[in-house]
Each structure stands twice: as structure tokens, then as C-alpha cells.
Amino acid sequence: MATTSGPAGIAMGSVGSLLERQDFSPEELRAALAGSRGSRQPDGLLRKGLGQREFFSYLHLPKKDGKTTKRAPRNEPDYATLYYREHPRAGDFSKTSLPERGRFDKCRIRPSVFKPPVGSGKGFLSMQSLAAHKGQKLWRSNGSLHTLACHPPLSPGPRASQARAQLLHALSLDEGGPEPSLSDSSSGGSFGRSPGTGPSPFSSSLGHINHLGGSLDRAPRSPKESGPLAVLSCLPEPPPPYEFSCPTTEEVAVLPEAREELKRDLGDQDVSNSFTQVLEERQRLWLSELKRLYVERLHEVAQKAERSERNLQLQLFMAQQEQRRLRKELRAQQGLAPEPRTSGSSMEADPNARPEEEARWEVCQKTAEISLLKQQLREAQAELAQKLAEIFSLKTQLRGSRAQAQAQDAELARLREAVHSLQEQAPREEAPGSCETDDCKSRGLLGEAGGSEAREGAEQLRAELLQERLRGQEQALRFEQERQTWQEEKERVLRYQREIQGSYMDMYRRNQALEHELRLLREPPTSWSPRLESSKI
């Protein structure tokens, strides 16, 4: 490669040599792309253009030494030499240099720029910050490399030229990004990106390489070199290449729909799917275990509540017993206390008297007892009403049995009259028997036979009448016993009610006395008022 040395001692070639140094043989291309993936994706579809690994392997292909490479002589002017002569402070134009703020200071590309992003997008952010810092005017830099691609030097083979065209399409991506989906004429594959996506981190990092040609285009040129470059810059822009883009918000929004569709597809499949059966079995096991744990926990909570309730009841009972014992002791002390004689002694005995709180507590207790007696009275009245209703029903049954007995007595009287009439008719038929003939004798025999049948019927009626009388007497006896029992119950209930009313009145009088004593305790004691005796309960 023909180079010239400037003041800084940096090697530099022509603009055409920038692409000529990338030439390599088909064997080198095959060796570089051998370790990459095939032309199909895991789902069986064709891949779009070059992948990241293939593109990186292309960038890192071994280059031939420029000093040993033989090239055919060219007659076109050396634009780099002319530019360097006019701009002595220019920097390095080699493959590892990058422009910065319009100056060609030496800036090497670190290998981390071309590493694929890993993790949660931290690499993407670093690339985007690099592009925002150094690539504010990168959208102008595509023209020079596109013009260079339109007139490529001699290449070893068609496959290398095709790979170079794909590389140039990847390098020609703007900072803002073109509108999606135009076809690549050189590679034959359709490239595009989703609408609404911003510049990818990879395209941002490659913008510095594209900026090299743009810087050369923006440099001042001599009249000799402006002609060929003007012709090259008049060529049309190539179609936008494929851009490596990260998932966008629209793609993320489509994910739930895809998940639902996958669930529907799984649901439409055969029920005997082993994966679905395993999931359902695990779900059933989890539900059963959860229910069992819930029942056990509920049982433990119920047992704990029962234990706490029993403990509270026991404590309440013990407190009531202690209260009764203390009240008995207090009453015993009050009964054994000597009666005061003078007002001075009564004033001294006042601190030992029953306190106001204890009197209030006794009033509350008596009120509770009164309410309990009222409840018992209401229960006794309800029971009395029930007994009265039963007595009324028994009286109704007694009336019915009496009416039935009267009907039976009427039937019995009728039967008696029939028997008497039959007995009176029998002697009348036997009286004219002295002058009877054979026919009369035969008739008399028939009459005797009929009389015997009547007597048997009368005896049967007498037996039935006797049974009915005995049954009526038994019913009357049972009714009398039941009436006596109900009378005793009624007297007992009335006596109990009178006792309850009497105890209620006694309790009311005691309550009035306690309230009066409480009022006296609340009033300030005077020297001339005598001390009232507390009523004994």
C-alpha cells in the first residue's frame, strides 16, 4: 500500500484504499463464517442477512500486510495525500481511528464496543451514550462509504463481494434510522425493522466508522479532486440495511396475546398430554395440602379459643368466690363492731365504715339479682300460660267424652226398653197354650225358639251395657285424677308466683334502703346527725 508520511509520522492511504484493505479471498470468507450459525433459524425459517457473530468475524478477519500486497498502479489522484498536505494537523485515517468533534485526533476503537450486549441492557446504554457523545453529525457520514461501495476495487470472488455489500449495508445505518423495510438488492434477503424503534446500540457504535467517510467528504478539496467526487456523490443512496433492534413496547404489549394464544393451543390439544397432566396433578396436590393446612390451623385456633374461654370462666368464678368471701368477712366485721355513742366516736369510726365503692357494687349486684328474678317471673308466667292452655284442651276433651257417654246412655235406655217389650210379649204368647192344636204347638215351639234368641240378644246387650258403664266410670275416674293433678300444679304455680313477687318486693325494699344509705355516704357528715345503721341483707 502506498502511504505518505506527514509531520506526525502517521501512515495514510487513499480513500479507495480504505475498502481495498478489506479484500480477502473466498477461502478466508468461508473460514471466517464456518463457526457461525447456519442460514436457518431454530424454528426452520430463513435468517435475514448476516448475524452478529458473522458480522464480527468479518470485522476481525486477518488483513494482509499493506507492504507486501501488490496492487495494480492507478492513475487517479491520491486524495488522502492532497488532503494531508492542505491540513497538516489532521489525524490518522487508518481502520482503527475515529473522528471526534470535527478533528481527526487519534482515537482507537476498543473491543468492548463490538461485543454483543449481555444482561439487562447495560451494554446497550453504554453504546448509546457513546453514540450520543461522539456521533451528533453521523447522519451525514453514509454518503462517502456508499460512493466507495459503488466503485469497489477488484475482489477475489463473487461471494466476497456479496459479503462486503452486506457489511456496507450494515455500516450505512443512520443515527436516526430510516423508515422500515426496504429490500437489499445485493444480498437478496429482505431487511427491515419494526416501526417506531429508535437507533440500536450496535448501529450507534458503527456510526463512528461511517463518520470517517463523511469527514473526508466535508473536507475542502482542490478543483482537480472535486470532479470525480462530485460524480460519486451524485449516485443515489443505497437502501437502508437491516438493523439489530431490541424489543420495543409494542412487542412487549403483544407478548400477553401470544401467551394467551399459546394457552389456547395447549388447551385445544389432547387431554392426555403428560405435561398438562403433571401440572394438573401438582395443582390438585397443592390445593389438597393447602386445604389440610387450613383445616389444621382452624382447628388449632378453635382449640386455643376454647381454652382461653375456659380459663376466663375459671378466673371469673374464682373472682366471684373471693368476692363472696370478702363480703362475708366484711359483714362479720360490721356485725362485731361496737356501736358508737358520741358524735366524736362516730367521726372516728367513719374511716372504718363501708366505702362508697363497695356500696355501689352491692347496689349493682342487687340490680342484677332483681333482673334475674324478673326473668324467672317471666318464665313462670309463660309456663303458667302453657299449663292453662293444656287445661283448656283437657276440658274440651272432657266435654266430648261426656257427650259420648250421654249418647251411650241413650242407646242403653233404648235397648232396655226393647228388652222389656220382648219380655212382655213372651208371656202373652204362652197364655193360650191349653187349647192349642198341633199347629199351635208347632207355632209355640217356633215362638219359644224366637224367645230364646231374643233372650240371648238381651243378655248380650246387658253385657255390652255393663262394659260401657265400666268404661265410663274409668274415664270419669281418670278425668278426676287429671283434674286433681292440674289443680295441684296450678296451686303450685300460683304459690311460686306469689313467692317470687314477695321476694321481688323484699329486694325492692332492700334496694331502696341501700340507695338511701349510699346517698347518706355521699353527703358530708355533720356533728349532730346520728349514724344510721346499715340494713342487714
UniProtKB/Swiss-Prot annotation:
Keywords (A to Z) from UniProt: Cell projection, Coiled coil, Cytoplasmic vesicle, Developmental protein, Neurogenesis, Phosphoprotein
InterPro entries reported for this sequence: N4BP3
Any one Pfam family match given in the protein's UniProt record, by short name: Fez1
GO cellular component, one term: axon
Top-level taxon of the source organism: Eukaryota
Residue ranges, compositional bias (Low complexity): 178-207
Compartments reported by the entry: Cytoplasmic vesicle; Cell projection, Axon; Cell projection, Dendrite
Signal sequence extent: none
Single Gene Ontology BP annotation: innate immune response
Main localization (coarse): cytoplasm
Regions of compositional bias (Basic and acidic residues) in chain numbering: 351-361
Disulfide bonds: none
Annotated region (Disordered), positions in chain: 173-234, 328-361, 423-458
Coiled coil region boundaries: 295-501
List of residues that carry Phosphoserine: S172
PANTHER family associated with the record: NEDD4-BINDING PROTEIN 3
Record note on quaternary structure: Binds NEDD4. Interacts with 14-3-3 proteins. Interacts with MAVS.
Stated role: Plays a positive role in the antiviral innate immune signaling pathway. Mechanistically, interacts with MAVS and functions as a positive regulator to promote 'Lys-63'-linked polyubiquitination of MAVS and thus strengthens the interaction between MAVS and TRAF2. Also plays a role in axon and dendrite arborization during cranial nerve development. May also be important for neural crest migration and early development of other anterior structures including eye, brain and cranial cartilage.
Record-stated family: Belongs to the N4BP3 family.
UniProt protein name: NEDD4-binding protein 3
